[in-house]
């Protein structure tokens, strides 16, 4: 599995150009990408990071971490996913960094998702759907989710996001219309971000098969 992640990550380096400022996501596959960034002879101007974890990793390789407010639109964003369907729609948020990931994806011209083959699914929803929630609204949001969907929200106890919020993981969802569900869940008061990347899906998916496959 680690080899598949490494293959996807190293393939993504081909899309990095000198003097770029790139967006960098979070997770085990992205960690391989950051390591590959540190080894490549290409020299980027810096990176916008989606988490404190990735920020620390980038700095270990001497890569300057920049604020999105100061960079404007980014040419490229590279991140992983928990699930990916044939239409490049994603479930993300296993690492609890979904809000910053969605912000950077929206701010980027090209969003490349790097995954191992096991992350491919015919229909999203095999894994729980993470939702970042304002702490005081946790119970309200959970009730609203149960009223609006067939899902079962579970509080990810002990996890606080980099934004100071909590995560509800919604199990047993039948996601037949990802864009519609993303919009509906976003309307619940107290929801900060839904881990469905359907409206802003990936532009390119690199699957770390042997050899890597492009979707």
From Swiss-Prot:
| One Pfam entry name | Rib_5-P_isom_A
Give the pathway listed in the UniProt entry for this protein. Answer: Carbohydrate degradation; pentose phosphate pathway; D-ribose 5-phosphate from D-ribulose 5-phosphate (non-oxidative stage): step 1/1
Please give the InterPro entries that the UniProt record associates with this protein: NagB/RpiA_transferase-like (IPR037171), Ribose5P_isomerase_typA_subgr (IPR020672), Ribose5P_isomerase_type_A (IPR004788)
Which Gene Ontology terms describe the biological processes this protein takes part in? D-ribose metabolic process; pentose-phosphate shunt, non-oxidative branch
Keyword vocabulary terms for this entry: Isomerase
Q: Which reaction does it catalyse?
A: aldehydo-D-ribose 5-phosphate = D-ribulose 5-phosphate
Q: What is this enzyme's EC?
A: 5.3.1.6
Gene Ontology molecular function:
ribose-5-phosphate isomerase activity
- Binding sites annotated in the UniProt record for substrate: 26-29, 79-82, 92-95, 119
Spell out the GO cellular component terms annotated for this protein, sorted alphabetically and separated by semicolons: cytosol
Active-site residues, Swiss-Prot/TrEMBL: 101
Instruction: State its role.
Output: Catalyzes the reversible conversion of ribose-5-phosphate to ribulose 5-phosphate.
HAMAP family with a match to the protein in the record: Rib_5P_isom_A
Q: Note the subunit structure.
A: Homodimer.
Which family does the record claim for this protein? Belongs to the ribose 5-phosphate isomerase family.
Can you say what this protein is called? Answer: Ribose-5-phosphate isomerase A
Q: What gene does the UniProt entry assign to this protein?
A: rpiA
